Amino acid sequence: MKKTILASSLAVALGVTGYAATADHNQAHASEENIDQAHLADLAQNNPEQLNEKPLHAGAYNYDFVLGGNEYTFTSDGQTWSWNYTTAGAQSASSNTIQDVTAQATTHTNETSANEVRTQQQSSNTEVAAVEAPKASSNTNVQTAQTSTSTKSTTTTTTTSTSSIDAIANQMAERTGVSASQWKGVIQRESGGNANAVNASSGAYGLFQLLGHGEHAGMSVQDQMDKAVEVYNNQGAGAWVAW
């Protein structure tokens, strides 16, 4: 798209479009041809796209007429064509300032070639193909959900089995003199048998939910048992609420 600024404030519209056609050097004035002046004037006023799309007919022509106070001009050399309309007499009024590109723009010249039309069509096709993109995004979401599920499954395997809890409770009973059933109740109540359980608010960790602001994190089950025995020997059953 190329825009050309004209100085005249009376020009209303101007379109120029490139087009390949069979050359015909015969030219005719509007008065010499049987053309529908009213129809051409209506196209210029209300449907300029049709005039930009193709010439009036093949070959060279030159139609110029005045209708309704406007002067209309339609020309073609057989390869390119142009059309415009202005208030009658506007050209002579602005001939002295036609080169003044600083004047207020009132007319735009539009130039379109066949290559540009094809380029625009190709661009439209590309935009349609791009609609397929959301499918890839949907698949990605599904894969993410599957990954999340797998992670949760892995986390649940850290829960200590019932037989292991019984064995831990029996060892704690032997080392402290407190019954295995009581130690089993503490383990199930405090951590549900999860040796890696962490209380987000207090920082308590492991099977016995030992307090220590994180220093117990990563301890083995045996280390947790040793620490629990130490806490019991120092603080007694009161170290665990609702013994």
Swiss-Prot record:
Keywords: Glycosidase, Hydrolase, Secreted, Signal. GO terms for molecular function: hydrolase activity, acting on glycosyl bonds. Residues 106-127, 136-146 have a biased composition (Polar residues). GO terms for cellular component: extracellular region. Residues 1-23 form the signal peptide. Residues 147-159 have a biased composition (Low complexity). The keyword Cell membrane does not apply. CDD domains: RPF (cd13925). It is an enzyme of class 3 (hydrolase). Coiled coil: none annotated. Residues 106-159 are annotated as: Disordered. It is found in: Secreted. Its EC number is 3.2.-.-. The keyword Metal-binding does not apply. Belongs to the transglycosylase family. IsaA subfamily. Is able to cleave peptidoglycan. This is Probable transglycosylase IsaA. It comes from Staphylococcus saprophyticus subsp. saprophyticus (strain ATCC 15305 / DSM 20229 / NCIMB 8711 / NCTC 7292 / S-41).
